[in-house]
């Protein structure tokens, strides 16, 4: 049975669930396509209708155990098909997450392996359960990590740790992931969902405009910018309602109430 990507909405928050529970949420080709479509849909939503934060999680107490190995024989042994899988299926899906202006929070439980680790690395805030584990032990399967995916992980982990993880097919436990900055917090397994929901709820009270512009600027910096035009455009928020509301609320000693539109 194929896996699925489910998008649900509750108030200002959305949830994207990786669901292939019979295989610990292994990500099949259809799920990569659906993941891309889901985040392109979120990014394309009108600002007045978009959620203020998105929680990315797995079904059934696991985040994602990697790719669906049962599908590998269909493309991995042909160079052109293998290239297309990584560059035309996986890469655009990950890019859709990275290009999303909405804050993304990874709710990590259990296995966060391979493609699951890459998806988590695209999220802005990553919270792990104490028994979660992280890695990409694909050297055991006889293949290396694709260049774009390795570049992504190199931005989430120190180079020595990433080398050890890949060359020794080593897994990190939650404490190690926290120590090396891969995750922002570790809580008891039973508290992960509640903790992430609380953090997402807090983000939802803040300026969505500020989040959107901050994420865009961080992407520009990662790409070697911002350039002169991007620097100029950055200040277009000056006369916005959110900017005025935030300053007014501070001066009036009240919580801000940010409304889009």
Residue spans of the language-model regions?
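Glycine- (often His-adjacent) and acidic-residue-rich active-site loop
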Residues: 58-93, 142
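CoA-thioester-processing core
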Residues: 93-99, 107, 113-166, 180, ...
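C-terminal long alpha-helix characteristic of the crotonase
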Residues: 21, 127-132, 183-228, 239-241, ...
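Well-ordered beta-strand positions
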Residues: 125, 164, 168-170, 176, ...
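Glycine-rich phosphate-binding loop at the start of an alpha helix
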Residues: 66, 87, 91, 114, ...
């Amino acid at each position: 049975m194929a896996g699925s990507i489910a998008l649900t909405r509750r108030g200002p928050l959305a949830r994207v669930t990786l669901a292939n529970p019979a295989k610990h949420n292994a990500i099949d080709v259809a799920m990569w396509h659906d993941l891309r479509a889901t985040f392109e849909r979120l990014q394309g939503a009108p600002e007045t209708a978009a959620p203020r934060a998105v929680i990315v999680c797995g079904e059934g107490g696991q985040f994602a155990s990697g790719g669906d190995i049962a599908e590998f024989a269909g493309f991995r042994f042909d160079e052109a098909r293998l290239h297309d899988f990584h560059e035309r299926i996986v890469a655009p899906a990950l890019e859709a997450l990275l290009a999303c202006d909405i804050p993304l929070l990874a709710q990590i439980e259990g296995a966060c392996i391979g493609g699951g680790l890459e998806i988590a690395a695209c999220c802005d805030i990553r919270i792990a359960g104490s028994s979660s584990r992280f890695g990409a032990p694909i050297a055991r399967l006889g293949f290396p990590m694709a260049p774009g995916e390795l570049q992504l992980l190199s931005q989430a982990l120190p180079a020595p740790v990433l080398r050890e993880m890949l060359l020794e097919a080593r897994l990190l436990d939650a404490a190690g992931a926290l120590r090396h900055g891969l995750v922002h917090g570790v809580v008891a397994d039973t508290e992960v969902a509640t903790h992430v929901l609380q953090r997402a709820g807090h983000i939802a009270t803040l300026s969505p405009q500020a989040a959107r512009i901050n994420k865009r600027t961080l992407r520009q910096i990662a790409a070697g910018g911002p350039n002169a035009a991007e620097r100029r455009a950055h200040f277009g928020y000056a006369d916005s309602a959110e900017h005025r509301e935030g300053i007014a609320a501070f001066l009036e000693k009240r919580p801000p109430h940010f409304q889009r539109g």
